[in-house]
Amino acid sequence: MVIELIINTPSRLHLTLIDLNGERGRLDGGVGITLNEPELVVGLEASDDMGVEFTSHAEGKLREEYRSKIMEAARRTLKHIGSDEKFHFTVRSMFPAHSGLGSGTQLSLATARLVAEYHGMKFTARELAHIVGRGGTSGIGVASFEDGGFIVDAGHSSREKSDFLPSSASSASPPPVIARYDFPEEWNIIIAIPEIDRSVSGRREVNIFQEYCPLPLRDVERLSHIILMKMMPAILEGDIEAFGESVNEIQGTGFKRIERELQDPLIDRIIDSMISAGAPGAGMSSFGPAVYSVTDEKPGNVAGAVAEIMGPGRIIVTGGRNRGAFMIK
C-alpha cells in the first residue's frame, strides 16, 4: 500500500528586523505575522527515485527553485537521520519565491517534517530548522511554522553570531521567541505582490547586509520603542489604529528604511494607495516586493485602490493564522 503524507504550512509577513547594530550584545531580532493565505501544501510518497512534481500552476523558474529547495532539504534530513530512502514529492499549493512571504523557510521545513514523519521521528520546528539550515537571522518563519500568530524573536547573541548576514547565509541557530500572541481574527490583511523585478536574494542580499550594517544605535532604540510600547500592546488590546501607526512608523526606521529605498517606486505608490483607501497601516514585507496593509473594515476598498495602480500582480485578502503547520494526513 502506498502511503502519502501531506503537510500544510503558512506564509508570513516579516515586518522588520530589529537590531542590526549589535552594540548591546545581540544581533537581528524580528517581528512578523503568520498568514492564512497563501499557503503551501506538499505531499510525500516512497519511491524508487527522488523526484518532485507540481499539481498547481507555476512558471518554470519557480518550479526549479521549489525543486531545488525540496531536494536539498530532503538530502540534509535523510543524512541527519541516517536513511537512504527515496521519495516522490508533490507540490499541491505554492506561493512565489523571493516575494517577501517566506517560501524558502516554509518549503525546507515542510520537506524535513514530511521525511521525519515518514520515519516515525518527531522534531521541533527549531530542530528541523537546524537540520535544513534555516532561521540563521530571522526566527519569524520558523516560529510561524511552529505555532503561527504574531511573533517577536530575540535575535542572536554576539557570541553565536558576529556577522551581519541574511538567514540564507547564516549558520546560527533559530533565535528564541520573546512573544507570541494570537493575531486578532477580526482584522483583515490585504497583500499586494506586484510583478516587478526587484527581488533580493542570494549574493545580492548578503552584499546589502554587508554594505549597510551596522546601523546607528539610535535607529535600533527607536525601533525597539515602537515595537515594545506601541505595536505589542496594540495586538493585546485589539487597537488597530495604534497597530497601523506602528507599522507606518517602522517603514522609515532602521533596516526597513533601507529595504524600502532599494525597491521600485511602485512599492511606495501601492502603500500610499492603501493608506488613502482607509487602511490604518501599510508596509513592505522583508525585502518585498510583497506589500501589506491591515484594516478592520471594508478590505475591498483597499484591494480596489491597489488594483487601480498596481498593474500585473496578485492581490490577496486574508487574515492572521494562529496555528502553525499541520499534517493533513
Curated annotation (Swiss-Prot):
GO terms for molecular function: ATP binding; beta-ribofuranosylaminobenzene 5'-phosphate synthase activity. Its EC number is 2.4.2.54. Its cofactor is Mg(2+). Catalyzes the condensation of 4-hydroxybenzoate (HB) with 5-phospho-alpha-D-ribose 1-diphosphate (PRPP) to produce beta-ribofuranosylphenol 5'-phosphate (beta-RFH-P). Also catalyzes the condensation of 4-aminobenzoate (pABA) with PRPP to produce beta-ribofuranosylaminobenzene 5'-phosphate (beta-RFA-P). Only 4-hydroxybenzoate is known to be biosynthesized by methanogenic archaea, but 4-aminobenzoate can be used as substrate by growing methanogens when it is present in the growth medium. Coiled coil: none annotated. Pathway: Cofactor biosynthesis; 5,6,7,8-tetrahydromethanopterin biosynthesis. Optimum temperature is 70 degrees Celsius. The lineage of its organism: Archaea, Methanobacteriati, Methanobacteriota, Methanomada group, Methanobacteria. Keywords: Glycosyltransferase, Magnesium, Transferase. It is an enzyme of class 2 (transferase). This is Beta-ribofuranosylphenol 5'-phosphate synthase. Homodimer. Belongs to the beta-RFA-P synthase family. Changing residue 26 to K: 10-fold increase in Km for pABA and 3-fold increase in Vmax. Optimum pH is 7.0.
